[in-house]
A protein has these predicted regions:
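Membrane-penetrating hydrophobic segments
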Residues: 1-13
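Acidic/histidine-rich helix-loop elements
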Residues: 26, 49-68, 89-91, 120-140, ...
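Active-site neighborhood of phospho(di)ester-bond hydrolases with catalytic His/Asp-centered motifs
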Residues: 54-56, 81-87, 110-116, 163-165, ...
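Active-site-proximal beta-strand elements of phosphoester/diester hydrolases
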Residues: 49-59, 188-199, 221-225, 286-292
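Conserved beta-sheet core of the metallophosphoesterase superfamily
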Residues: 227-310, 318-319
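N-terminal active-site segment of His-dependent metallophosphoesterases
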Residues: 15-101, 121
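Binuclear metal-dependent hydrolase catalytic cores centered on His/Asp/Glu-rich metal-binding motifs
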Residues: 125-160, 164-166, 171-232, 299-302
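Core catalytic region of metal-dependent phosphoesterases/phosphodiesterases
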Residues: 66-171
Length: 320
């Protein structure tokens, strides 16, 4: 075969591969999955297990009904507490979709923080800009155009805790069976919650810790939309038993065997999604960063990074 023919064949193969990858990015973004993790609590914490459902980054807009159905279906899973880590809207037209998605979860206890796309609708930009560093929010956009107050009222009406630069301690009902054959009993787990508004647009203010934060019967959770290091460091200093975040989309376009290219914040790319350990000043906290469920309407693609929700079991340390 002549060199020209070889080059022509190679170009054809490369083109076909590119078309295949592009097609798959459209398929994969429509394949949400539920992931499960276990976090072992430190010895000395006198509590029962707590199962947390985390929902991150739905970015709902018309045409995303498959995500609405997926979120609604999560109500059939077994969990005790819901944490919504923000970026619920993909457009103003998605407001009713957000309520419809979360409605079956409203009879469970929960807490929430917001991301920038709960305040400001996304703007069209080149994907390549994400490769040069975290996206920038225009200082000229200082009046939210999304119905964040209405969404906050919707969550609060169900009893969910608004953790916008707030901290609180609550009792979460959990069902446990003490002995095989027993009927389920309702018990309570005391949970300390600390949250901030979106660090990505510099709305974060670390609140004062509530009384009882360090009590021996209290599970401590740190919640943020974007996992910026300054917030993770504060939560780790406060000895959070688990930090929950979203925002990164897991990198959204990943390289198999390498992982995420970017995190859209100052978090190392190796921590773009999943369960890890964050260390600061001699202390450590488990960190779960969700790859999230949605995408911007202007970049509706995923590769090697399926959309996801997560259930994290916080399990008491095994007794010797």
């Amino acid at each position: 075969m002549k060199a020209r023919e070889l080059l022509s064949s190679a170009a054809a193969v490369a083109t076909a591969a590119g078309v295949g990858v592009a097609a798959w990015t459209q398929i994969e973004r429509r394949m949400p999955t539920l992931r499960r993790y276990v976090v072992e609590l430190p010895e000395g914490l006198e509590t029962r297990a707590l199962h947390i459902l985390q929902i991150a980054d739905p970015h709902l807009y018309p045409g995303q009904d498959f995500l609405v159905d997926f979120i609604r279906g999560l109500a059939d899973e077994e969990f005790d507490f819901v944490v919504a880590t923000g970026d619920n809207f993909g457009a103003i037209a998605g407001a009713d979709m957000v309520k419809r998605a979360f409605e079956p979860l409203m009879d469970r206890p929960g807490a929430f923080v917001f991301g920038s796309n709960d305040y400001y609708s996304p703007r069209k930009k080149r994907w390549s800009t994400y490769l040069t560093g975290p996206s920038k929010h225009s200082k000229k956009r200082n009046v939210p155009d999304l119905p964040w107050e209405d969404l906050a009222s919707f969550f609060e009406a169900a009893g969910w805790v608004n953790l916008t630069n707030q901290a609180e301690i609550i009792d979460v009902p959990v069902k446990t069976s003490i002995f095989a054959g027993d009927a389920d009993r309702t018990n309570f787990v005391r949970v300390g919650l600390i949250g901030v508004d979106d660090p990505h647009i510099k709305r974060d203010r670390i609140p004062e810790l509530p009384d009882g934060w360090y009590a021996a019967d209290t599970i401590r959770l740190g919640i943020t939309h974007a996992p910026y290091q300054r917030v993770l460091n504060e939560y780790t200093s406060d000895e959070a038993n688990l930090i929950l975040a979203g925002h990164t989309h897991g990198g959204q376009l990943c390289v198999p065997g390498y992982g995420a290219l970017v995190t859209n914040c100052d978090l190392p790319r190796e921590l773009a999604s999943g369960l890890a350990t964050w260390s600061f000043a001699g202390k450590e906290s488990p960190l779960h960063v969700s790859a999230g469920l949605g995408t911007s309407p202007y970049a509706p693609v995923r590769f090697a990074c399926r959309p996801e929700a997560s259930i994290i079991e916080m399990r008491p340390a095994a007794r010797a």
